[in-house]
UniProtKB/Swiss-Prot annotation:
Key words of the record: Antibiotic, Antimicrobial, Secreted, Toxin
Full protein name: Cytoinsectotoxin-2a
Source organism per UniProt: Lachesana tarabaevi (Spider)
Tissues of expression: Expressed by the venom gland.
Function field: Insecticidal and antimicrobial peptide. Has insecticidal activity against larvae of flesh fly S.carnaria. Has antibacterial activity against Gram-positive bacterium B.subtilis B-501 (MIC=1.25 uM) and Gram-negative bacterium E.coli DH5alpha (MIC=2.5 uM).
Lineage: Eukaryota, Metazoa, Ecdysozoa, Arthropoda, Chelicerata
Amino acid sequence: SWDSIWKSAKNKMDKIMRQKVAKWMAKKEGKSVEEVQAKVDAMSKKDIRLHVISHYGKKAFEQLSKSLE
């Protein structure tokens, strides 16, 4: 059914977002992904989404400012 397909896709998306946030935080803090993973797993879905939005928002702003120069 559509409901089970949606839940499956949503769970996969959440897993991918957690992996991305762990990778970004590890790079920022200079730690391994495994060390940061526990911190990311403890975060709420809302916090993870905010990290994703802020990361891509910064990238978009940097690209926009480069194109305006």
